[in-house]
Structures are given as C-alpha cells and as structure tokens.
A protein has these predicted regions:
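Bacterial N-terminal signal peptides
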Residues: 18-32
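Active-site microenvironment of metallo-dependent hydrolases
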Residues: 25-26, 34-60, 64-65, 73-74, ...
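Active-site metal-binding motif and surrounding structural segment of the metallo-beta-lactamase
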Residues: 75-91
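Divalent-metal coordination cores built from histidine and acidic residues
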Residues: 85-90, 99, 104-202, 284, ...
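Hydrophobic faces of well-ordered beta-strands that scaffold small-molecule active sites
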Residues: 93-99, 120, 143-145, 201-203, ...
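Alpha-helix-loop-beta-strand connector modules within alpha/beta enzyme cores
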Residues: 138-143, 219-228
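Active-site neighborhoods of metal-dependent hydrolases
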Residues: 155-213, 246-250, 255-398
Length: 490
C-alpha cells in the first residue's frame, strides 16, 4: 500500500541549511569577539622571556594591550605591531633607584642602558610637586623622587636651594645643630613633600653632619608614620654608620634602604653586608644597593669634604679627578675648587676592583647607578654588570642580574606605592615596561674619558607599552614615561 504525504527531503535539507547558517553566524560572532580579544597592540614574538619573581625562563610570545602585559603564550600571537625577538632576551625593564641626573639627555642614556624607571631617592628633590610637574607628559621613561632631608634642613636653617646642586653646600645649614623647634619644622616640610608624592625620605647624613643621631631618628619617624622607606647615605664612619641607621630603623619601624654600600663602606663592605643580613634575619626591613665602579662622585663643595676627609677615607688630593679633563687634584687646586660658589662634581678614586666585585655578587645588593653627569655610571651601569659579571666573570647568573635590576627594586618600592607591584615582573597584569636585549652584545661603552657614550645591545625598550628604543635607536618624540608617586596619606 502506498504511503500518503509528499517527499520530506527538501524540508529536511532546508532545516539543515538553517541550522548550519545559525551555527556559522554564532561561530562568526564568537570568533569575532575572540579575535578582538586576542589581537594585541604589540606582540613580542619568540624571545627568551625572564620573570625574576617566578623564575620563568622560556621562549614565549608576549601580548601587550593598553600598556599592560595581557598574554604570555607558547603559541604565536597576532598584533598591530609584532617585534621579532628571536634569539633575544626579554626581561622586565630595569629600575634605577639612585639616579640624580633627571634630565631628558640622561633619560636617553638610561633607556639605552635598559632602564625604564629612574628615581632620585638618595637625596630627593627640594620640591617634589615641582619635580613631578616639570616632567609630566614630557619624560621618555618613568620618574619619581623622595622628600629631601638635606634640602628641608637647609631651608629651615637658612640655606636657599642652589641651582644645579645635588646637595646643599657645606656651611652652617649642614654643619650646625638644629634646635628642637627647627627639627619640628624640618619634619613638617618632609610631611608636606610626602603628601606631594614623595616615595620616601631621602636622608644624606654625610652631607648634613650637624644632624645628631637623635635628629636623624626623628626623620626616620616621619617616614615610619606613613610606612615609607628611608633612603640613606650613611654618616661616613663605615661600620658605625651602618649600625646607626639599622638602630634607627629598629626603634622607629621605618623601612631602610642603604645606598651604595660599596662606596659607603669601602674595605669594610663585607662586614657592612653582614650587618644588613643580620638585621634582615631578625625581621627588619633593610635593603641595599651597589654600582660596578671603583670610583665615586660627588660635589666638591659639599660637607663630604669637610676637614678630616683624607684621614677618614685614607685617600689624598691625587685620588680626586676633574671629570671633564681627567686632571688629578693638588692641594692648591682642591682649595680653589672648594671655595667656588658653583656646584662642581669631582670623581673620587677610593675603592678596589676586588671589593666591588665581591659586593656586586652578593645576593643582598640591588644594582643602582648613582648617576651623575660626567661619571660613566650615568650611562653604563647596567650594561657593565651584564658584560663583566654575567658574561666575563660569570659571578652572576642571567636571572640573578635581572632580579637585582628589576624585581628587587620593585619590591623595595612596594612600601611606597602600589604601582610598584606591576613593575619588575614579566607576568600577565604587569606594566609593559620591558627590555629586549642581545645578551652577547649588551655592554657599556662609557668610560671616565668618554662618560656620555651610550650602552649598546638593547634592541627594543618599551615603557608602559610604547617603544622608546626601536631597532637599537631612540624613538624620537615619544614621552610615555609616568610619575611613580607615593601612596596618598591615610
């Protein structure tokens, strides 16, 4: 018997077609969303990425969007700009906690040396708000400063700011005592500077020898009130000076960072580092730094050269050198320069290579340049560490060097600002401050004869996701640097 009804095949075919179209449309919508999510502003392709916090060391692609790292992938990623990093090192940009020279020219040198953030923390700025305003929307790399104890003290004791000076000149405002009312006024100025964005309190005890131990403790208390670190240039008596500031940190609770322990302690540096290690083992928040040169630099009219400097440091006039000419000083030339009203920097040859090598290799030390114009460390500190300590001496592993230059400084800053938690790491969610370098080629070129020669070997540098070095050259006209400021008052 023949069944009733027509042929259902056209209807089935039509239904299948409708379903297929719907699936295709849904797939297109979902794929479009996914494709939009997976397309990045910048992709770094095929580089060997290093994250010093997690110890990740692997070849990956890195996706960047909106100034942040948003993807790290074993598979290739797509982006508006793809940087081929095959055979190159990709690491968090270096953070220099100790950079006095905060000019546009210095920022270019720092960038060529792999630095994405350069901060003036040892001495700080006499006017934090002015410092930040001058650089807003005009900086190649990130910047910031501390509140300045030397300049606050000088202002209260009657010494105006000297244009071009890093520290106040030696005089009554640096060498004389402050009475209780003056100490209170210094404290108040520092609180105001912290409120303006200071990352901590910069304390130059050797540059203000008139400040008693009790006065210094009160400056530590100002930082401790806000949970900010103190960044300290110690008094100059080596072991006793380090003991003084560790004790001040212990009684006030202020986080303590001791600057350039290599030059502050010289031949006593190993014992000074043991003091730091002992303090840390007992729960104190104490950190330190070093730079890879046997010579330091400071202003000749500062209290650093008050009477007795030769005996204290075991050096003579001939160990002092004029940066621009290489001239070694005599007593007469020293006194002539010392009497000048203009701030003049002088190089001090006062350390040994063996001692510097020991300090740089110590796990406690971060790398920081103490950058000043005329000294090669202003241009070449980080490249020098890679060349001499990673490649040549092999006293640092590649990861150790990156950790000392990026992650450890970021950890130090976390007590100052939450922004630091996104610095010094190569992780999803971190700021895209990244250095891409040729490990075999990265080295310093600056010397005492040619201190302004930039390092070579950094192929690309990104600051907040924007390339500032592209193919080994500075990108003209870009200013992606941002202020790193202290947390608001509670």
């Amino acid at each position: 018997m023949k069944e009733s009804g027509g042929d259902d095949r056209p209807r089935c075919t039509f239904s299948f077609l409708v379903i297929a179209i719907r699936i295709a449309l849904l797939t297109l919508v979902l794929c479009g969303t996914a494709c939009a999510q997976d397309h990045y502003d910048v992709v770094i392709h095929g580089g060997r990425i290093l994250d010093p916090e997690t110890s990740l060391d692997a070849v990956r692609d890195v996706g960047i969007r909106g100034g942040q790292i948003v993807a790290i992938s074993e598979r290739p990623l797509a982006g508006s700009r793809v940087i081929d990093a095959t055979g190159l090192i990709v690491a968090p940009g270096f953070i220099d906690l100790h950079q006095h020279d905060q000019t546009a020219a210095a920022y270019r040198l720092k960038a060529m040396d792999g630095v994405t953030t350069a901060l003036e923390l040892e001495i700080g700025s006499p006017d934090v708000r002015k410092f930040l305003d001058q650089r807003r929307n005009a900086a190649l790399i990130n910047y910031g400063t501390s509140a300045s104890q030397p300049w606050a003290r000088a202002a209260v004791l009657g010494q105006p700011v000297v244009e071009g000076a890093i520290v106040p000149p030696s005089g009554p405002a640096t060498n004389g005592p402050a009475n209780p009312e003056q100490v209170q006024r210094i404290e108040q100025r520092l609180r105001e500077e912290l409120n303006a964005g200071g990352l901590g309190v910069g304390i130059g005890i050797q540059y203000t020898p008139g400040a008693s131990r009790l006065e210094i403790i009160e400056m530590f208390r100002v930082a401790a009130e806000r949970g900010r670190p103190v960044f300290v240039h110690v008094r100059g008596d080596r072991l006793e000076s380090v003991e003084e500031v560790i004790a001040a940190a212990a009684v006030t609770g202020a986080p303590l960072h001791i600057v350039h322990i290599n030059s502050s302690c010289l031949r006593d540096a190993p014992e000074c580092l043991r003091l730091v290690a002992g303090a840390r083992a007992r729960g104190l928040d104490v950190t330190t730094e070093a730079y890879p040169y046997i010579a330091g630099m400071t202003q000749i009219n500062s209290a650093r050269f008050n009477p007795g400097w030769k005996e204290k440091d075991g050096i003579d006039y001939s160990d002092l050198m004029i940066p621009s000419t290489g001239e070694r000083l005599t007593k007469e030339r020293f006194e002539q320069m010392r009497a000048s009203q203009q701030p003049q920097s002088i190089i001090i040859v006062d350390n040994t290579q063996a001692m510097v090598d020991q300090v740089i290799a110590n796990p406690l030390t971060m790398i920081a340049s103490d950058g000043l114009p005329g000294h090669p460390r202003n241009a070449g500190t980080f490249g020098r560490v890679f060349a001499q300590y990673v490649r040549e001496r092999q006293s640092l592993t590649l990861m150790d060097a990156v950790r000392k230059m990026s992650y450890m400084p970021a950890l130090r800053l976390e007590r100052s600002t939450p922004e630091a938690r996104k610095k010094g790491r190569l992780q999803v969610g971190a700021d895209a401050d990244l250095v891409i370098l040729d490990l075999a080629a990265f080295h310093d070129q600056s010397t005492f004869e040619k201190p302004f020669e930039p390092s070579i070997g950094v192929r690309f540098l990104l600051v907040n996701g924007s390339p500032v070095i592209d193919g080994g050259a500075i990108v003209p006209g870009v200013t992606p640097g941002r202020a790193i400021v202290g947390s608001p008052a509670p």
